[in-house]
Amino acid sequence: MSYLLDPSRKTVTITRLQAMRDAGEKIAMLTAYDSSFAALLDYCGVEVILVGDSLGNVMQGQQTTLPVTLEHMAYHTECVARANQTALLVTDLPFGTYGTPEMAFASAVTLMRAGAHMVKLEGGDWLAPTVKFLVERSIPVCAHIGLTPQSVHAFGGFKVQGKTDEGAAQLRRDAQAMEAAGAQIVLMEAVPATLAGEITQMLKVPTIGIGAGADCSGQVLVLQDMINVYPGRKAKFVRNFMDGQTTIEGAIRAYVAAVKDGSFPAAEHTFSA
């Protein structure tokens, strides 16, 4: 299944994302785990599709992302890749699959063969040698810093990161180490907006925020969160884009527009130090 796209639409590459960042054009990113939503996101102009290990929560009903396996990620990547025509496709390396550089490379090869254009991994400056190892072997990397859900038990829960001077300094080191190792995107989750803005200015590569303020180069949300599939309490950084819309397509287009014009995230969706 796919949608008939405008033939003038160009494939989104890492080079194009860098050009968007340099020009100050915001990048819209959303999750997808199946071909139907992948096709719709691509049709609506989402530049980056993330096959996140959040599928453990969204698709499997897990409380954390820890039970997700490499086989799960490869399967859902294949589903998304079949329908995606122009978006850059990023897939998470799941918990326990990148403990060493060699393990990370073997896992990344599996995901790239399934259709990913880039892999995402969670960690700080200690992970720089692994990122460098992957990049040297032609595996593009998105580095995920700040709140890293695979470390939920080590953190003692889902908590905003970088609120103290020491924590903020560590996140700056993490971001710089990831860029120096060759990461071509740095994703920041649950980071005070001012700090995320400072890091964005400090780096030359694009930054993507989720609960990290409006000054990042782009934004990402879990699709099912932003179309309000699940009733009840949402994370602070989530906005219900179904408000005022009658279709999911309308909600996705509203999200893309809000990211592009800078109206999302608003102050109510961000954290302070």
Swiss-Prot record:
Note accompanying the cofactor annotation: Binds 1 Mg(2+) ion per subunit.
Cellular component per GO, a single term: cytoplasm
Sequence positions that bind Mg(2+): 53, 92, 122
EC number(s) recorded for this UniProt protein: 2.1.2.11
Ranges in a coiled coil: none
GO-annotated molecular function: 3-methyl-2-oxobutanoate hydroxymethyltransferase activity; magnesium ion binding
Domain of life: Bacteria
Co-factor(s): Mg(2+)
InterPro entries, per database record: Pantoate_hydroxy_MeTrfase, Pyrv/PenolPyrv_kinase-like_dom, Pyrv_kinase-like_dom_sf
One Pfam family of this chain: Pantoate_transf
UniProt entry keywords in alphabetical sequence: Cytoplasm, Magnesium, Metal-binding, Pantothenate biosynthesis, Transferase
Active site: residue positions: 189
Positions annotated to bind 3-methyl-2-oxobutanoate: 53-54, 92, 120
GO terms for biological process, alphabetical: pantothenate biosynthetic process
Catalytic reaction(s) noted: 3-methyl-2-oxobutanoate + (6R)-5,10-methylene-5,6,7,8-tetrahydrofolate + H2O = 2-dehydropantoate + (6S)-5,6,7,8-tetrahydrofolate
Listed pathway(s): Cofactor biosynthesis; (R)-pantothenate biosynthesis; (R)-pantoate from 3-methyl-2-oxobutanoate: step 1/2
Cellular localisation: Cytoplasm
Subunit structure: Homodecamer; pentamer of dimers.
Matches recorded under PANTHER family: 3-METHYL-2-OXOBUTANOATE HYDROXYMETHYLTRANSFERASE
Entry function: Catalyzes the reversible reaction in which hydroxymethyl group from 5,10-methylenetetrahydrofolate is transferred onto alpha-ketoisovalerate to form ketopantoate.
Family the UniProt entry places it in: Belongs to the PanB family.
Protein name, entry field: 3-methyl-2-oxobutanoate hydroxymethyltransferase
Organism this protein belongs to: Cupriavidus pinatubonensis (strain JMP 134 / LMG 1197) (Cupriavidus necator (strain JMP 134))
